[in-house]
Amino acid sequence: MSTVLAIHGSPRGERSHSRRLADAFLQAWQAANPQGRLTRREVGRGALPHVSEAFIAAAFYPQPEARPLSMQADLALSDELVAELLDHQRLVISAPMHNFSVPSGIKAWVDHIVRLGLTFNTQQDNGVAQYQPLVQGKKVLIVTSRGGGGFGPGGEHEAMNHADRWLRTALGFIGIEDVTVVAAEGEESAPERFAQSCGEAQQRLLALAQSF
């Protein structure tokens, strides 16, 4: 049975363009995979706390198997999010570009799932840290929208794109390298072009849904 975890990162919820595009994809995916399992995780409306000092102390406790109960409680949500990620074969992330990066809820989610001993390991080699990704066999679709244009590959503002490019880096760090990005651009800078861009993005998403 195919399984998809959808991470919704916009604080605008259903009014978000990236969310609407992702929903169109997910609807098409469900139609193509009637026996598939879809799980949704809302992180864009303040539902997910950012990591705290207590979280950091617990996550990097030198003896993870001997964490006090209080530390285990500090990591309970993170443990749940990691387990949720590992339990699904496919991941769909809807995340608009906010000030050249991702919404803070997406950053919080990444901070919770990039976990030493769970999604990556590290060891010293001649005093230099070597990282080992632990997540295997996952495939990711990033659905994004951008107020301006030219932020995609080869665009004039590509170097300013720290949104989906950063997500690729973070996911690759834990072992997820099969990543596809579908973007709609120009909501604020070129409304007429944006409508066309959304249409093109949706057509691409509907095609991707058949084999995701």
Swiss-Prot record:
Enzyme Commission identifier(s): 1.6.5.-, 1.7.1.17
What Pfam families does the database record attribute to this sequence?
Flavodoxin_2
Task: Quote the record's binding site residues for FMN.
Answer: S10, S16, H17, S18, S145, R146, G147, G148
GO MF, one term, reads: oxidoreductase activity, acting on NAD(P)H as acceptor
Q: Cite the entry's keywords alphabetically.
A: Flavoprotein, FMN, NAD, Oxidoreductase
Q: How is the cofactor bound?
A: Binds 1 FMN per subunit.
Q: What cofactor(s) does the depicted protein rely on? A: FMN
> Which reaction(s) does its UniProt entry say it catalyses?
2 a quinone + NADH + H(+) = 2 a 1,4-benzosemiquinone + NAD(+); N,N-dimethyl-1,4-phenylenediamine + anthranilate + 2 NAD(+) = 2-(4-dimethylaminophenyl)diazenylbenzoate + 2 NADH + 2 H(+)
Family per similarity comment:
Belongs to the azoreductase type 1 family.
Q: What is the protein's known function?
A: Quinone reductase that provides resistance to thiol-specific stress caused by electrophilic quinones.
Recorded protein name is FMN-dependent NADH:quinone oxidoreductase 1
Q: Which gene holds the coding sequence for this protein?
A: azoR1
